[in-house]
């Protein structure tokens, strides 16, 4: 199930968090074949998000990883269509994207969900790490391997949660000059 919640953070927390994001620098974090520009989060913020998700989903949840990231018209401009089934050696059940910055584009913008020509809409949970890595390197930018299924539109303080096995990317691949700031979290159902 995919769902989204508008006004996810309460107003004070949202304003405080965006002030902090805008007054701090993002640092490059390198992974095989990809760099991200991130800011770390803190336990209080992660706990707030997790508690809100637990209330919404009706399950006890465990955070695997959460951080803020930015993309703009220069930084992080590739498609990188992928699944989140392998996060720091763990297999999350779900992923969350929380849009933090104001929308600066009138074009369709948000989180795209894709269908792979072989696997369909999601990567099988039994997929090996080698196949996961191969797909990221060989197919994440090859639009001939993918069909766009849908796009959940961008909205400031909108959270979208989806199964971690689903193939997705930002949409489109290039964000606006001021930057698309998001919080991402990968989590398990206990």
Placement of each model-derived feature along the sequence:
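Catalytic core of non-heme Fe(II) oxygenases with the double-stranded beta-helix
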Residues: 74-190
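Non-heme Fe(II)/2-oxoglutarate
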Residues: 1-81, 110, 117
């Amino acid at each position: 199930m995919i769902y989204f919640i508008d006004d996810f953070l309460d107003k004070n927390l949202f304003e405080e968090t965006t002030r902090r994001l805008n007054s701090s620098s993002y640092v490059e974090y390198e992974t095989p074949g990809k760099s991200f520009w991130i800011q770390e989060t803190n336990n209080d913020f992660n706990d707030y998000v997790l508690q809100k998700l637990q209330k919404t989903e009706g399950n006890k949840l465990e955070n695997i990883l959460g951080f803020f990231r930015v993309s703009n018209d220069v930084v992080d401009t590739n498609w990188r269509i992928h699944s989140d089934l392998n996060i720091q050696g763990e297999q999350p059940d779900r992923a969350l994207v929380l849009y933090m910055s104001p929308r600066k584009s009138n074009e369709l913008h948000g989180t795209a969900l894709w269908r792979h020509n072989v696997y369909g809409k999601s990567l099988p949970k039994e997929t090996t790490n080698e196949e996961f890595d191969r797909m990221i390197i060989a197919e994440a930018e090859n639009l001939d391997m993918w069909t766009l299924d849908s796009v959940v539109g961008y909205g400031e303080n909108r959270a979208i949660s989806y199964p971690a096995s689903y193939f997705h990317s930002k949409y489109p691949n290039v964000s606006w000059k001021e930057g698309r700031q998001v919080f991402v979290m990968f989590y398990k159902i206990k």
